[in-house]
């Protein structure tokens, strides 16, 4: 992996060069929350954010996504987007995108996702954890791939890791704003990462978790928290790896319809409903437990479906904590 340095005085020009790649989207503050939005100036960015409400998956899998329109006897695909830059993506969210890649880019690849993924230029950025983060315990606190370039803050600029062919091309075409990395830069980078590793307050005990879940299907803990859960589905909407959707046709006008796919949630009562009226998960208990098995049942090939970003904890209106639930399930078997 190649390392270069971006001095602080070149940061505004670096941003302008990114705008030449495509539309730039970055974290923007709204009161106490943050969102990825289109930005035209570095002054609009809040690079010291902890997490956005919606993860970057919304740029690849939209909440409401028009697939094609049907007009009389003709089917026309809805025009796709052009190239864009995701500026300031954290390591956990990059790991979330990598999980989506395994799903949507496996044969046969999803054409809508594939097109947007190819059009994306991802700029990662380092962060400091808060009380909700537990990505370190899942190994998603540091990304080695899945990005084009990654920024690590230094006292006098940024250490830039180059992670893709597109990243190499960008650095090569803009050599005038980059410099070589010094031993002092590498030392500062290492010191920051060591400090960051010690800052995590929450961790998930993943040892033998699949076996624990095998034995805990009837645990009373599921019922305890299912009664507290509102069933709103908020945790699935803000999750970087939840990808369930439904497809529906809507009439635009006479003889013209639009086929859409939109977010669905396993917390919705109709999610498990099939023809004949049977529902695979008819109760809130069934749906609550299912999400934990979906996120935490370790697959040797795919790994976990949770990246430890902390969104489900922070944005849960019932204040249910992901790690606490699993800890209680484990303790109930001892």
Swiss-Prot record:
One cellular component term from this protein's GO annotations in UniProt: cytoplasm
Cofactor note: Binds 2 [4Fe-4S] clusters.
Any GO molecular function: sulfur reductase activity
Binding site for [4Fe-4S] cluster 1: 229, 232, 235, 239
Pfam annotation, one family: Fer4_22
Protein name per the record: Sulfhydrogenase 2 subunit beta
Record function comment: Part of a bifunctional enzyme complex that functions as a hydrogen-evolving hydrogenase with sulfur-reducing activity. May play a role in hydrogen cycling during fermentative growth. Activity exhibited with NAD in addition to NADPH. The beta and gamma subunits form the sulfur-reducing component that catalyzes the cytoplasmic production of hydrogen sulfide in the presence of elemental sulfur.
SUPFAM superfamilies named in the record: alpha-helical ferredoxin (SSF46548)
Originating organism: Pyrococcus furiosus (strain ATCC 43587 / DSM 3638 / JCM 8422 / Vc1)
Cofactor (UniProt): [4Fe-4S] cluster
